[in-house]
Amino acid sequence: METSSPALSVAIGVLAVLLGMTGFGVYQAFGPPSKALDDPFDDHED
């Protein structure tokens, strides 16, 4: 079995981190923690 190149390992690691951060952001925006978010447009009605 051939060993994979270090560049491929780094690329997969970076991809995993980016996907994790994206998933966490979507969870924060639309999941249960989103109930604690305030809408600044609702706070300052004209």
UniProtKB/Swiss-Prot annotation:
Keywords for the protein's UniProt record, in alphabetical order: Membrane, Thylakoid, Transmembrane, Transmembrane helix
Annotated TM spans: 7-27
A Pfam family it matches: PsbN
Membrane topology: Single-pass membrane protein
Signal peptide stretch: none
GO biological process, one term: photosynthesis
Subcellular location as annotated: Cellular thylakoid membrane
Domain of life: Bacteria
Chief site of localization: membrane
HAMAP family attached to this UniProt entry: PSII_PsbN
Classification via NCBIfam families: PRK13183.1
Homology family: Belongs to the PsbN family.
Name used for this protein in its record: Protein PsbN
Taxonomic source organism: Parasynechococcus marenigrum (strain WH8102)
Taxonomic lineage of the native organism: Bacteria, Bacillati, Cyanobacteriota, Cyanophyceae, Synechococcales
Gene that this polypeptide is encoded by: psbN
